[in-house]
Amino acid sequence: MECHRAGAEVFTGDATCRKKSVELLEELGLPKGLLPLEDIQEFGYNRDSGFIWLVQGKKVEHTFKKIMQKVSYDTKVTAFIENGKLRKITGIKTNAMMLWISINEVFVPEALPEKVTFKSSNGLSRTFDAAAFALGE
């Protein structure tokens, strides 16, 4: 993370970090409610490398109610972001059959912009309606 700090836009404070992270998700065609973090202390974005990071006060578990999917967000979430995609994600896990599985990629397929696909490091993937990840869901 430190190597991406140089030249990055860095924001602090929960309200500012939420606003900036949601704006970035929207700008790049990702659902605005994809990162429902709490007490965000820092948000950074290096436009040159595409690297983002969010630091929150404590680990958060969130259930996306429309799909009844529980997701855990660590105190530090990092990823490389590009149009319609988060890749090389750290700090996000989902609960499947009583196991926590790390998510390493999230993308919105160009051919199906109303869908969001999540991929794990072991090759498993699942696709959901993007509406399930609207802001406030």
Go through each PLM region and give its residues:
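Extracellular/luminal recognition modules and glycoprotein regions
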Residues: 1-51, 55-65
